[in-house]
Amino acid sequence: MLKLIVPTIMLLPLTWLSKKHMIWINTTTHSLIISIIPLLFFNQINNNLFSCSPTFSSDPLTTPLLMLTTWLLPLTIMASQRHLSSEPLSRKKLYLSMLISLQISLIMTFTATELIMFYIFFETTLIPTLAIITRWGNQPERLNAGTYFLFYTLVGSLPLLIALIYTHNTLGSLNILLLTLTAQELSNSWANNLMWLAYTMAFMVKMPLYGLHLWLPKAHVEAPIAGSMVLAAVLLKLGGYGMMRLTLILNPLTKHMAYPFLVLSLWGMIMTSSICLRQTDLKSLIAYSSISHMALVVTAILIQTPWSFTGAVILMIAHGLTSSLLFCLANSNYERTHSRIMILSQGLQTLLPLMAFWWLLASLANLALPPTINLLGELSVLVTTFSWSNITLLLTGLNMLVTALYSLYMFTTTQWGSLTHHINNMKPSFTRENTLMFMHLSPILLLSLNPDIITGFSS
């Protein structure tokens, strides 16, 4: 794993030693080269020592998430150039250092084999994210958003730490591989039920589950473009990854405890989708759509079948790329109109036809149109929820309908209609922006040709 961690750490001195005119080129190209390294981990069936050590290791669940994390760093750097154009050089370097340190902590979180190390790095991701939101956000409300983000995450994570200490005192080890192989069947007692809640609550806040989601729209809306992209694409996936790892160890207790959370996530999925139909703020709409998609992932994980895990992993990767793409498009609108209100940016199709094309593709990917990878993820989850209970088909089917409605509502409101009077001159779409959209969309479309590489555990 050091072949991935060390080059990423070396991006920090590269950033600070780069000249003013080379800082963007150096960081983008080197981070793009680093994003190729996780592809080597797909060979681990024949060569297991390739990516395994006592401290860090990768498996078919970790590797797709590592790919997503490393692929996203060059994209966030490309997306932030306009946002940072008026900042002094030292602040640009500090901003890039925050993004790189966030990537380092994410890689270590996904690959940690000890649960206490996983917890430490899980919490470490909070620091650079909080700095990015509260320092580089656009509006004064960013401080309020940062407070929500901090307290929700910390309060949710404290029971996890207590549960980990209790488990270590009881079993003498917190190694994920050992715990998975030697897991005892937990009885359905009050103490074990509370321990299950303590283990999963941190991840349900992070996902977030409906009811624990109030921090997410605020954080998304107030964060700068890189903050929104990383938050939507990778940080929410930490919750899904942690739940997948720990619910397997806590079986068969998960099967007893899952029912209220399954109902809550299915209900929350429809509620948040419906909220999207009433949004006027573009970033807020995309944030609520993230909650809706992640509710489907929570449902899949709690059903605890190999197929549902496959659907959850595919959906996490697909949602990471799609939501990041939507935030990039929303940011391109914001940089030109200086407003997140959708009605004020209507009719942009006449001025920016190529950007309208990216908007159309992003909206169609969001509603899971073939041949995107989103469709495969949603169908896998749909089939597993239906086999678990027939009634869920009504809820998941209704959710797909509402998702299609708000995706088309978002596209038509921003692209069609007559131009508003305050838009009198507008810069055309830049090559950088078009490259950015292409680099988001190409994996969404290409992964559908060979989805085996991101099917997680079942591979």
UniProtKB/Swiss-Prot annotation:
Its EC number is 7.1.1.2. The chain crosses the membrane at residues 22-42, 60-80, 102-122, 145-165, 196-216, 224-244, 257-277, 284-303, 308-330, 351-371, 391-411. It is found in: Mitochondrion inner membrane. The keyword NAD applies. Signal peptide: none annotated. One of its GO terms (molecular function) is ubiquinone binding. It is a multi-pass membrane protein. The keyword Kinase does not apply. One of its GO terms (cellular component) is mitochondrial inner membrane. Changing T420A: Found in a patient with mitochondrial complex I deficiency; uncertain significance. Changing V313I: In LDYT; possible rare primary mutation; decrease in enzyme activity. Keywords: Disease variant, Dystonia, Electron transport, Leber hereditary optic neuropathy, MELAS syndrome, Membrane, Mitochondrion, Mitochondrion inner membrane, NAD, Primary mitochondrial disease, Respiratory chain, Translocase, Transmembrane, Transmembrane helix, Transport, Ubiquinone. GO terms for biological process: aerobic respiration; cerebellum development; electron transport coupled proton transport; in utero embryonic development; mitochondrial electron transport, NADH to ubiquinone; mitochondrial respiratory chain complex I assembly; proton motive force-driven mitochondrial ATP synthesis; response to ethanol. It catalyses: a ubiquinone + NADH + 5 H(+)(in) = a ubiquinol + NAD(+) + 4 H(+)(out). NCBIfam families: NDH_I_M. It is linked to Leber hereditary optic neuropathy: A maternally inherited form of Leber hereditary optic neuropathy, a mitochondrial disease resulting in bilateral painless loss of central vision due to selective degeneration of the retinal ganglion cells and their axons. The disorder shows incomplete penetrance and male predominance. Cardiac conduction defects and neurological defects have also been described in some LHON patients. LHON results from primary mitochondrial DNA mutations affecting the respiratory chain complexes. Core subunit of the mitochondrial membrane respiratory chain NADH dehydrogenase (Complex I) which catalyzes electron transfer from NADH through the respiratory chain, using ubiquinone as an electron acceptor. Essential for the catalytic activity and assembly of complex I. Core subunit of respiratory chain NADH dehydrogenase (Complex I) which is composed of 45 different subunits. Belongs to the complex I subunit 4 family. This is NADH-ubiquinone oxidoreductase chain 4. The gene is MT-ND4.
